């Protein structure tokens, strides 16, 4: 029989030698189990067709073409290389997906722990954030691990029952996560548009929202388990493909309820929030304090001040030439009084209420210190016997202030108790070094706040020059804690500088600092507007980028049966959607400083977090 086979093979193919069945090899596998060994020569006895299908020959012809040699091809190296790269791919995929699952679990656990442990985070608004973290935690614990096994094994090997459980949990948790984003957007929209919403946002209302979210997700996820499946569902599982029901009606229902309708609602709500926030920022910027003193007004005021200084020089020369003022009967010293009035109008609103503040006694310094907030006039104060009186001053409106500035036009240089004239800026500089400044700053605050918050009205500054030569003790000393006295010559010299340079210099520089302040406010408001836009863009952008590709693919696969999507692309889109559960803890907490501080306390302990905060301060 062996001879017959040999003859038949030799007759069938001229290229095959007659001794083909005698191969100098130790052994050869035939039909997976048959070995025949004879005197070191292997003799192969098989069916001819089976033999030829399993043995690969490599033909080699010598240079003369007189003989042909056949060698068996060894694919071991190629097979080993392919298996090695498959192993590397599996390990890399397992590491990446495992890290993604771990980060998702840690992030959502941190959010839940922060809300539970930190009392200041236990408010009604954060209940939605906590429920969102629970949904994302379920995605990380129930859905992503089985999905990772599916990807690494390159097929579903866990049976149809587990496939039903996995797909149902997938739809339930992902739908709940997305619908929580809608609930948070609606909550923020109501907070912005309804002033009384903080009173209406009760725990019962928020828990009702959370219940509706989970109930809707449950309906969408359990529909296939009650018969809404396509006919090829079991066939796909047998082919190791575990997918949600591909019934066209169910896919349209599920994708619309899970993604497309929530997407439109989120985009609409955040767009309205952005528009409202932008309008409020612009309105606040318009109400902010903005001095509109023009350059022409400043120039005319400076010219008038120069004329006034020249008049004072002439008056001083007359005094030095021997002109004297009669002495009062009580012997307290001569008084030279001279009044000149100038008006400067600085408009920062529409209301025309005005008030007069006239420099006065020590006991009323706290009341008059409100004028310190208005730094565009140089207030000269005498040491003693000065009277403060206020009239028509409205603390609530702070609409306008008519400041009467007292300055000296002449001085009796021969008076031993000459007055020391100091400017407002010098008072503030000295007063900050003493304890008494705290009480005066309390008086400053209301006016400064009203100006900063954009109070309306016209500020009319009236500057009568009034000088009274009198005895010892200064209001500046009271402001600075009751210390300090000056000599007559030094006071006279200071008067000329402060009355001329102080008032004129401050007045000439009114426009520039407040223009810079207005520009700085505009930049700040623009920065706040950009930050609000960036926050909303990050929230909506992350949601759209993560889930839009998957739901477009899901709807396309159900509507277009002929369309084929590569397995790698389908897996990428699916895990990109899962990645949204990794981002949610970051997006919805990183912009909240309370959450950031809570995370630091959880990571480093309360003492370390407190030390870090004090170091920053």
Curated annotation (Swiss-Prot):
InterPro entries given in the database record: GPCR_Rhodpsn, GPCR_Rhodpsn_7TM
Q: What is the effect of changing residue 14 to V?
A: In strain: NC-100
Substitution effect: residue 310 to G: In strain: CA-003, CA-035, CA-062, CA-066, CA-081, CA-091, CA-126, CA-145, CA-010, CA-015, CA-017, CA-018, CA-023, CA-027, CA-030, CA-061, CA-064, CA-070, CA-072, CA-075, CA-086, CA-090, CA-093, CA-095, CA-096, CA-100, CA-105, CA-114, CA-128, CA-130, CA-132, CA-137, CA-142, NC-010, NC-022, NC-028, NC-036, NC-037, NC-054, NC-068, NC-092, NC-095, NC-108, NC-100, NC-111, NC-119, NC-125, NC-142, NC-001, NC-003, NC-005, NC-006, NC-008, NC-012, NC-014, NC-017, NC-018, NC-021, NC-023, NC-024, NC-025, NC-026, NC-027, NC-032, NC-038, NC-039, NC-043, NC-046, NC-048, NC-049, NC-053, NC-058, NC-059, NC-069, NC-070, NC-071, NC-073, NC-077, NC-084, NC-089, NC-094, NC-096, NC-097, NC-098, NC-101, NC-103, NC-104, NC-105, NC-107, NC-114, NC-115, NC-118, NC-121, NC-123, NC-124, NC-126, NC-127, NC-131, NC-136, NC-139, NC-141, NC-146 and NC-149
Which one GO biological process term can you cite for this protein?
serotonin receptor signaling pathway
- Membrane spanning residue stretches: 96-116, 129-149, 165-185, 206-226, 257-277, 535-555, 571-591
According to the UniProt record, one GO cellular component term is: synapse
Q: Which residues are glycosylated?
A: 31, 41, 51, 58
Where composition is biased (Basic and acidic residues), the residues are 317-327
One molecular function GO term is:
G protein-coupled serotonin receptor activity
Q: How does this protein lie in the membrane?
A: Multi-pass membrane protein
Q: Does the keyword Glycoprotein apply?
A: yes
Q: Where in the cell is it found?
A: Cell membrane
The outcome of changing residue 309 to H is: In strain: CA-017, CA-061, CA-062, CA-093, CA-132, CA-018, CA-027, CA-070, CA-075, CA-081, CA-086, CA-096, CA-100, CA-105, CA-126, CA-128, CA-130, CA-137, CA-142, CA-145, NC-024, NC-048, NC-071, NC-104, NC-005, NC-008, NC-018, NC-025, NC-028, NC-043, NC-046, NC-049, NC-054, NC-058, NC-070, NC-077, NC-095, NC-098, NC-101, NC-103, NC-114, NC-115, NC-119, NC-136 and NC-141
Effect noted on mutating residue 460 to I: In strain: CA-040, CA-055 and CA-098
Write down what this protein is called.
5-hydroxytryptamine receptor 2B
What is the protein's species of origin?
Drosophila melanogaster (Fruit fly)
> Lineage in the entry?
Eukaryota, Metazoa, Ecdysozoa, Arthropoda, Hexapoda
What is the primary gene name for this protein?
A: 5-HT1B
């Amino acid at each position: 029989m062996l001879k017959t086979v040999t003859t038949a093979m030799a007759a069938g193919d001229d290229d095959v030698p007659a001794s083909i069945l005698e191969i100098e090899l130790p052994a050869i596998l035939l039909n997976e189990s048959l070995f025949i060994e004879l005197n070191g020569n292997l003799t192969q006895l098989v069916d001819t067709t089976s033999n030829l299908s399993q043995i690969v020959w490599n033909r080699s012809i010598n240079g003369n073409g007189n003989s042909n040699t056949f060698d068996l091809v060894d694919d071991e190296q190629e097979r080993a290389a392919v298996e090695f790269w498959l192993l590397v791919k599996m390990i890399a995929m397992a590491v990446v997906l495992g890290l993604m699952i771990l980060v998702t679990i840690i992030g959502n656990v941190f959010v839940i722990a922060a809300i539970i442990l930190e009392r200041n985070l236990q408010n009604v608004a954060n209940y939605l954030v906590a429920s969102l973290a629970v949904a994302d935690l379920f995605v990380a614990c129930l859905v992503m691990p089985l999905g990772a096994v599916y990807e690494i094994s390159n097929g579903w090997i866990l049976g149809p029952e587990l496939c039903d459980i996995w797909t149902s949990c997938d739809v339930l948790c992902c739908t709940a996560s997305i619908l929580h984003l809608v609930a948070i957007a609606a909550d923020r929209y109501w907070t912005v548009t309804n002033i009384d919403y903080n009173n209406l946002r009760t725990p019962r209302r928020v828990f009702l929202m959370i219940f509706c979210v989970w109930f809707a997700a449950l309906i969408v996820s359990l529909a296939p388990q009650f018969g809404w499946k396509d006919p090829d569902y079991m066939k796909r599982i047998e082919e190791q493909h575990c997918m949600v029901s591909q019934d066209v009606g169910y896919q349209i229902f599920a994708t619309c309820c899970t993604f497309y309708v929530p997407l439109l609602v989120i985009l609409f709500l955040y767009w309205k929030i952005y528009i409202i926030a932008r309008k409020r920022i612009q309105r606040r910027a318009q109400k902010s304090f903005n001095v509109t003193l023009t350059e022409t007004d400043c120039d005319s005021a400076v010219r008038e001040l120069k004329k006034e200084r020249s008049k004072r020089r002439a008056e001083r020369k007359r005094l030095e030439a021997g002109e004297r003022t009669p002495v009062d009967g009580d012997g307290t010293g001569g008084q030279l009084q001279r009044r000149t009035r100038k008006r400067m109008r600085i408009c920062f609103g529409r209301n025309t209420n005005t008030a007069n503040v006239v420099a006065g006694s020590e006991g009323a310094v706290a009341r008059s210190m409100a004028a310190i907030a208005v730094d565009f006039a140089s207030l000269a104060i005498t040491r003693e016997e000065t009277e403060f009186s206020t009239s028509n001053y409205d603390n609530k409106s702070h609409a306008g202030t008519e400041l009467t500035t007292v300055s000296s036009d002449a001085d009796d240089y021969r008076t031993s108790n000459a007055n020391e004239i100091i400017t407002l800026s010098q008072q503030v500089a000295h007063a900050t070094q003493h304890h008494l400044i705290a009480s005066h700053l309390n008086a400053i605050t209301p006016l400064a706040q009203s100006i900063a918050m954009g109070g309306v009205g016209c500020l009319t500054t009236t500057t009568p020059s009034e000088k009274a030569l009198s005895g010892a003790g200064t209001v500046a000393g009271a402001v600075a804690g009751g210390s300090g006295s000056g000599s007559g010559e030094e006071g006279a010299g200071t008067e000329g500088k402060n009355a001329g340079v102080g008032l004129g210099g401050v007045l000439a520089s009114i426009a520039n600092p407040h223009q810079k302040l207005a520009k700085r406010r505009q930049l700040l408001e623009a920065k706040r507007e950009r930050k609000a836009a960036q926050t909303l863009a990050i929230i909506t952008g992350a949601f759209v980028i993560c889930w839009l590709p998957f739901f477009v693919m899901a709807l396309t696969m159900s509507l277009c049966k002929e369309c084929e999507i590569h397995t790698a692309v389908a897996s990428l889109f699916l895990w990109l959607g899962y990645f949204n559960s990794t981002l949610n803890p970051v997006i919805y907490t990183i912009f909240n400083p309370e959450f950031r501080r809570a995370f630091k306390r959880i990571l480093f302990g309360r003492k370390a977090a407190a030390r870090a905060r004090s170091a920053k301060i």
